[in-house]
């Protein structure tokens, strides 16, 4: 039997972008833990007119086909925000998915590497879809639970395939699973937190939803300061922050947010998202015409049972100090209690860098357990 020829084709049309988005439907048809992204949301992320990052960052997508069937995909990007921040000639790959076939996987990565090399990149790292501030990391442990909102899934054969091509670990990130409940803090710690945050010059509140975009911009400004020294950090631009605000606004509520200020200066924040993957897993990527009503019913009436905390930040000048520690616990306490009030049973805290041992220890101390590991890989690009 003659095997059909494998081709790697650049994505250039709306029809091909849709094929790029939909190829995972067949790939994961036997995996009950995979959640197909909503088509409109996924395609918007690939559109430079709606995604600020792509507007100024060269990028390309490819589809692998064999016998007319899509068997893989990959994207490559020269992230200008990353370039400006680090000054490194490192290109990134993302959106990688493929059948369990080394020829397919190897040719996808060879194609992406050639594209990056032709643009003078000397290193290839990822997966980033297409940024460290979006979905990123290859799932290497924890395939037995569906991903939380805005987190990736994957196949167990991906990591061995990348390592066989010479990719090595750059960093690991964890997702921790947390049982939401009242009274999670020991009595002495609760007394410490209450004493510190109840000072006259300290304010702890929910976001002002009448000025939601402004609140998100403030949160991003804190985030950029708080995480500036962390591995892989790339600051969020104002355009990305505004884009984030528009994406989050439909699913976020006051009880999902906390803002902490000292002497009138916003100094720490936290955001929790309802885990929409609970419900969209049955939508096959389609929200309209009927699934929109199902989504609203789930969000407003049935209520989500799980959530994810993707964003928390404390200004550097407070880190390592009693007020910074108190803010961290107070943020978790507030979103925990309000989440329980609204029916949340479990929450994912993600992602946390493997090297951030103080944060991991703090979360484990309140009952969270590491149950997913994601990995960023890197590889030098040798001249062809």
For the regions a language model picked out, list residue spans one by one.
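Short beta-strand-to-coil "C-cap" segments at the C-terminal boundary of structured domains/repeats
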Residues: 4-6, 178-181, 378-384
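Generic start-of-chain signal for non-secretory N-termini
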Residues: 1-33
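A conserved beta-strand-loop-helix scaffold within acyl/acetyltransferase catalytic domains
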Residues: 24-66, 74-84, 206, 211-314
């Amino acid at each position: 039997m003659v095997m059909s020829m494998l081709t790697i084709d650049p994505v250039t049309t709306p029809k091909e972008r849709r094929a790029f988005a939909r190829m995972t439907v067949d790939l994961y048809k036997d995996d009950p833990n995979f959640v197909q992204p909503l088509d409109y949301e996924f395609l918007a992320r690939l559109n430079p007119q709606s995604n600020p990052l792509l507007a100024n960052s060269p990028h390309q997508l490819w589809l692998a086909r064999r016998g007319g069937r899509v068997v893989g995909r990959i994207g490559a990007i020269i992230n200008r925000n990353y370039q400006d921040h680090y000054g490194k000639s490192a290109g990134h790959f993302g959106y990688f998915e493929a059948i369990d076939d080394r020829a397919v996987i190897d040719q996808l990565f060879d194609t992406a590497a050639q594209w990056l090399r032709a643009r003078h990149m000397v290193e290839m790292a990822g997966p980033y879809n297409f940024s460290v501030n979006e979905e990123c990391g290859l799932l290497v442990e924890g395939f037995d639970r569906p991903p939380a909102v805005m987190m990736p899934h994957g196949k167990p054969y991906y990591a061995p395939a990348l390592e066989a091509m010479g990719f090595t670990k750059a960093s690991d990130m964890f997702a921790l699973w947390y049982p939401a409940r009242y009274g999670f803090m020991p009595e002495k710690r609760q007394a410490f937190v209450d004493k510190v945050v109840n000072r006259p010059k300290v304010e702890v509140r929910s976001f002002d939803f009448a000025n939601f975009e402004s609140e998100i911009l403030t949160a991003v400004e804190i985030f950029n300061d708080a995480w500036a020294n962390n591995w892989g950090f790339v600051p969020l631009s104002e355009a990305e922050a505004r884009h984030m605000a528009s994406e989050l606004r439909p699913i976020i509520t006051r009880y999902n947010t906390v803002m902490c200020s000292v002497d009138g200066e916003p100094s720490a924040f936290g955001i929790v998202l309802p885990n929409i993957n609970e419900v969209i897993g049955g939508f096959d990527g389609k929200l309209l015409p009927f699934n929109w009503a199902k989504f609203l019913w789930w969000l407003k009436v049935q209520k989500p049972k799980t959530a994810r905390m993707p964003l928390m930040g404390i200004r550097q000048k407070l880190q390592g100090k009693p007020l910074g520690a108190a803010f961290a616990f107070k943020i978790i306490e507030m979103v925990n209690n309000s989440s329980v009030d609204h029916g949340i049973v479990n929450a994912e805290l993600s992602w946390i860098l493997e090297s951030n041992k103080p944060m991991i220890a703090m979360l484990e101390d309140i009952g969270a357990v590491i149950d997913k590991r994601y990995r960023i890989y890197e590889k030098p690009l040798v001249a062809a």
